[in-house]
Curated annotation (Swiss-Prot):
The family this protein is said to belong to: Belongs to the somatotropin/prolactin family.
Record's GO cellular component terms: extracellular space
Gene it is expressed from: gh1
Compartment(s) of residence: Secreted
Protein name according to UniProt: Somatotropin-1
One GO molecular-function entry: growth hormone activity
Role: Growth hormone plays an important role in growth control and is involved in the regulation of several anabolic processes. Implicated as an osmoregulatory substance important for seawater adaptation.
Chain positions recorded as Zn(2+) binding sites: 38, 192
GO biological-process terms attached to the record: animal organ development; calcium ion homeostasis; growth hormone receptor signaling pathway; hyperosmotic salinity response; magnesium ion homeostasis; positive regulation of growth; positive regulation of phagocytosis; positive regulation of receptor signaling pathway via JAK-STAT
Source organism: Oncorhynchus nerka
Coiled-coil region: none
Amino acid sequence: MGQVFLLMPVLLASCFLSQGAAIENQRLFNIAVSRVQHLHLLAQKMFNDFDGTLLPDERRQLNKIFLLDFCISDSIVSPVDKHETQKSSVLKLLHISFRLIESWEYPSQTLIISNSLMVRNANQISEKLSDLKVGINLLITGSQDGVLSLDDNDSQHLPPYGNYYQNLGGEGNVRRNYELLACFKKDMHKVETYLTVAKCRKSLEANCTL
């Protein structure tokens, strides 16, 4: 009986520590989701502002090109639809989100074009991407319990973003900026979806459907 009483403080301390870790983990998820939501809204606004400066024919042509083209981040293997997203583990969604954010560290610096609003936004984006990357890395560390499990595709290096956009051809800055902004908006939407699902799973909510 004495041994049971001796173990009680240890068990209670362990319970409180576990509860504290869960609360901190949820706090980090809340911050990460909030930040990527802001980035997604910012990306949407920047794309809409740029799209609004195009002539109708120019807009249609660029949209057709973009639909046939691809974003460099498409090299990152990720869920193809909502069903696959919901089947993916929390750790997998976090790793994909980390890779997507990391893939924009360089190109976010090239979003600066001849518009004062976009210059300010671009500076904000670089800082927010860096903060979000650190936050996702903390979530990965807290979710993997010391075991790093990556698919073979996760170890592949993406080709340099700069080289890709330097080879777009004679259309110049208009197509380059259109694709940058469209891809950025697309990828921030992906990360927002993945982090929202991962956060829901960690909170043990009954319904995490998209």
